[in-house]
Amino acid sequence: LLKRATVLGNFNPRDYMERRVWITARDGERIPVSLVWHRDCPAQDSPMFITGYGAYEISSDPGFSVSRLSMLDRGVLYAVPHIRGGGEMGRAWYEQGRRLNKKHSFEDFVDATRALQKAHLADAWRTVANGGSAGGLLMGAIANMAPECYAGVEADVPFVDALTSILDPDLP
């Protein structure tokens, strides 16, 4: 039995498109990226909201959120790169994005952004990145690594004391 929540207004799930694409990171690793957009707004040089986490072996699985509808209805491409450090691709994926390998998480996110822009799915002048908590650390890194890729970067409750975290063997 699958329960569906009622969405108020003129919501029609057929109005939205989704796709999983794969990009190649700078070290050759293939990174999955989930995309969603409004059917009437083709993903071509679109404004993009790209969000990431990539920590603690937590998977950023695709899912429905009513809060995204207004953005999608305005032609924004919503992207979630499943970067190393998360749990989407198993334990080794997580290990490749933690502690001294954390740079892979940052590089994966930037490489996904650049790949979507190079493919003309997204416009760099209208790309905004978002991440919270450990994703806030990601936002701090990408803002410094590739400021030309983002019109804005939002770090929600950022976890940014990386040195203490790397030195503490009890933290993931």
Language-model segments: residues:
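Non-catalytic accessory segments flanking enzyme active sites
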Residues: L1-Q44, I58, P62-L69, D73-R74, ...
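Alpha/beta-hydrolase fold active-site loops
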Residues: I31, P47, R126
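Short hydrophobic segments within beta-strands
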Residues: V36, T51-G52, N130
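Short beta-strand segments enriched for Tyr within beta-sheet-rich domains
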Residues: S46, V76, C149-A151
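Active-site glycine-rich loops that stabilize anionic/oxyanionic intermediates
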Residues: S46, Y53-I58, S133
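A fold-wide structural signal in alpha/beta-hydrolase
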Residues: M48, L72-H82
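Active-site-proximal cap/loop segments of hydrolase catalytic domains
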Residues: P81-P172
